[in-house]
Structure formats: C-alpha cells, structure tokens
Amino acid sequence: MTKEFHHITVLLHETVDMLDIKPDGIYVDATLGGAGHSSYLLSKLNDNGHLYCFDQDQKAIDNAQVFLKSYVDRGMVTFIKANFRHLKSELNALGVTEIDGILYDLGVSSPQLDERERGFSYKQDAPLDMRMDSDAALTAYHVVNDYPFQDLVRIFFKYGEDKFSKQIARKIEQARAIKPIETTAELAEIIKSAKPAKELKKKGHPAKQIFQAIRIEVNDELGAADESIQEAMTMLALNGRISVITFHSLEDRLTKQLFKEASTVDVPKGIPFIPEDMQPKFELVTRKPILPSQEELLANNRAHSAKLRVARKVRM
C-alpha cells in the first residue's frame, strides 16, 4: 500500500472468511479502497480464481495496481473504475454472469477522509467537495449553496438524523445570502452556531451528522448501495455469500432490511406448507451483526461504528 493511500482495513478476516472462499471461485470486492480486503481474499485463491474490484476513485485503483502487483501479474484481478451501482452491467460486459461471493465496505475510505482537498472532513479546512468520484458533477458546494431550504432540511433529517436540521438549514440560508459558503471550516462554524450551547458540550463534533448527510446526498450512497446489493444477490451462485460492512445506522438498516426480505417469506393464511417456488432464496449467516474485537478497536479508532452482516444464497 502506498504512503499516499494508507488505509487500515476494518474487520479484515471476518469479512473475507465469512465468504467461505473457494480457491477457484469468482469474487467481487465492490469497494476496493485501500485493497486490504482484496489482498487477503486473493491470498485464498489459486490461479484459476479471479477477483473483480470496483472503485470510483482512480487513485485507489492506481494504488492497488502497485499493492496487488503479484496478483495482477498472474492475471488474477481486474479493476473496474465505476460506481458499484453498475455492478451487473459492468460484470456482464466482461462476460461474468455469476459470482461466488462479494464484499462491501461501505462509507468513505481513510485516504479520502485524510486528503484535505477532497473536502470530506470537518477537522481540516478545504473547499467543499465530498465527491468519491472526482469526475462527478454534483459537489458539496452545490448542495450547500444552491439547494432550497426545504431540500436542505430534508437531507439533514433523512441522512443526518440531526434534530436541529431546520435551524442549521436556516443558518446556511442566511449565510449564503451574504456570500457563498466555500470551505468545510466555514460550514462547520455555521453548523455550530445553529446549535444550543448544551449540544456543543456533547461528545463528538457538532458538524458530524450534517457532513454525513451532505456526503450521502452528493454521492447518492444509499441509493447506490440499495441497487448494488440487490443486483449482487441476483448474481450470486448457489451457496454464494455476500458480506456487507456498514458504518452508520442508515446503511445498516438498509442492509438488514434487504437481507430480511431475501431470507423470509410471508405465508398466506390457510396454506399448510410453503411451496418450493415461494421458499426464500437466502439465509442469514449472521443473525446479529459481527462487531470489531476489542483489539481492533484499540488499533483503529475508525472501526468503532463498523457492523458486518453476511447472507448465503440457498436457492436459485
């Protein structure tokens, strides 16, 4: 891993081991990032196995080309620069119609957070950006300066779950009427000014939830995850598995709901047994989410909110 792309992988062994890797299987890392999961997964494959890696960030792919060079040279890995919401079409274009397993590590990678100019963090001043794909049109600047008041309130409530969403949206509206809000530091100060003093004394940065909400809006993170996970589940082979790491309640709720829908069936009253064609296609490998160990939490502070859920395809 290059110094420019340093990333500590969360729930490394649990996420990959839960896929029950077949050495000659076809696998997908839907969120390449720092390539930690990819590296460990590739170590379990033989030369007949293959891993397809998705990332919107060209820097992540460039880093992985170097970090995974030995596997690249053996023709065991293919990199795809695309949003994982296009999973099925991108894989189909490469002749892949069925996969043995897939993993997702949702959220922002550490290098994106740490790279000041990407504008993800409220901890350092930078232009408002927050794009995971630097070629995308919509930026945080556009959301903050151009979205109507009601749209700001909606995304702050929906994606940030911040009870002061209206007050924050009003402060933003007032500030941008004077001059555009251009940097993360400016926005963080406006958010702080909208919250009562007792809120500012609470643990955690007062801007965290609003920054999360804007980031989710800019990248349509939940919409993309919903589409991609559903596509992945249709592409899994029999006994294929899907591992999903989430970092906040919205992602976890979405994953839990998708897995529940795929692993349960509503039986109409009066039917004594469930016909085979109505049986659920998936079963939960994890009834409750797997959490990082105490050792991992001590080594990596960013692992604190991580949850891993896994499901297995039991019927086609």
Curated annotation (Swiss-Prot):
Protein's job: Specifically methylates the N4 position of cytidine in position 1402 (C1402) of 16S rRNA.
Gene3D superfamilies per record: Putative methyltransferase TM0872, insert domain, Vaccinia Virus protein VP39
HAMAP family referenced in this protein's UniProt entry, alphabetically: 16SrRNA_methyltr_H
Reactions listed under catalytic activity: cytidine(1402) in 16S rRNA + S-adenosyl-L-methionine = N(4)-methylcytidine(1402) in 16S rRNA + S-adenosyl-L-homocysteine + H(+)
Major place of residence: cytoplasm
UniProt entry tagged with the keyword Magnesium: no
Keyword Signal: no
Swiss-Prot/TrEMBL keywords: Cytoplasm, Methyltransferase, rRNA processing, S-adenosyl-L-methionine, Transferase
UniProt family annotation: Belongs to the methyltransferase superfamily. RsmH family.
EC number: 2.1.1.199
Gene name for this UniProt entry: rsmH
Gene Ontology BP annotations: rRNA base methylation
Protein name from the UniProt record: Ribosomal RNA small subunit methyltransferase H
GO MF assignments: rRNA (cytosine-N4-)-methyltransferase activity
Residue spans crossing the bilayer: none
UniProt subcellular location: Cytoplasm
Binding of S-adenosyl-L-methionine, residues: 35-37, 55, 84, 105, 112
One GO cellular component term noted in the UniProt record for this chain: cytoplasm
The organism's place on the tree of life at top rank: Bacteria
